[in-house]
Amino acid sequence: MEFLFGRRKTPEELLRQNQRALNRAMRELDRERQKLEQQEKKIIADIKKMAKQGQMDAVKIMAKDLVRTRRYVKKFIMMRANIQAVSLKIQTLKSNNSMAQAMKGVTKAMATMNRQLKLPQIQKIMMEFEKQSEIMDMKEEMMNDAIDDAMGDEDDEEESDAVVSQVLDELGLTLTDELSNLPSTGGSLSVAGAKKGEATAALADADADLEERLNNLRRD
C-alpha cells in the first residue's frame, strides 16, 4: 500500500514541509517588494523630470502610479508579516510536539518502572534485610563479648603492673629521701658504723611498708 499511495508523512515531516513552503513564500514576497521599491524610486525620478518640463498631465498620471505602487509595497509588507506569524506558530507547534513526544517517552519509562517495582517483593526484601541486620548485630555483639572475656585477664595484669610500678616509684622516692639523710663516705668510720644499724632498720621498715601495700592491693 505504501508503494502505491506513498508513505504517510509524520506530523514532524508535515510541519517541516509547511515551514519550508512559508519560508519560500516570504523570500518571494521580499523579492517582489524590492522590485516595487525600485519602481517607486524610478517613478519619483520621472515625476520630478516631468514637473521640470511642465508636463503636469503626465505628472498626475505618474503620481497615481506612485500611490498604487506604495500601496502594493505596504500590502507585501503586511502579507510577509502574516506569513511570518504563521511560521512562528508552526515552529511553536513543532516545539510543543517535541515536548509532547518527550513527555510520552518519560511516561512510558515511568509506567515500565511502576510495573517492575512490585511493592510486596520490595517489602519482603526490606524485612529480610532487617532480619539479617539484626542477626549480624547479635553475632557482632557476641564476638565482642568473647574478645573482651579473652582479653580481660591481660588488661587486669596490665593495670596491676601499672599500680605496682606507681607504688615502687613512690617508694623509690621515699628510699631516696631516707638515703639522703645517711652520712657521706667522707665522714668518720665510727660515725658511719654507728649509723649503719639505723640505715638497716630504715630499709627494713621500707621493705615492710612495700610488702604491706602489695598485700592490700591483692586484697582489693
Swiss-Prot record:
Residues 196-220 are annotated as: Disordered. GO terms for biological process: endosome transport via multivesicular body sorting pathway; exit from mitosis; late endosome to vacuole transport; nuclear membrane reassembly; protein transport. It holds the Pfam family Snf7. Residues 211-220 have a biased composition (Basic and acidic residues). It is found in: Late endosome membrane; Cytoplasm. One of its GO terms (cellular component) is late endosome membrane. Probable core component of the endosomal sorting required for transport complex III (ESCRT-III). ESCRT-III components are thought to multimerize to form a flat lattice on the perimeter membrane of the endosome. Probable core component of the endosomal sorting required for transport complex III (ESCRT-III) which is involved in multivesicular bodies (MVBs) formation and sorting of endosomal cargo proteins into MVBs. MVBs contain intraluminal vesicles (ILVs) that are generated by invagination and scission from the limiting membrane of the endosome and mostly are delivered to lysosomes enabling degradation of membrane proteins, such as stimulated growth factor receptors, lysosomal enzymes and lipids. This is Charged multivesicular body protein 2a. It comes from Xenopus laevis. The gene is chmp2a.
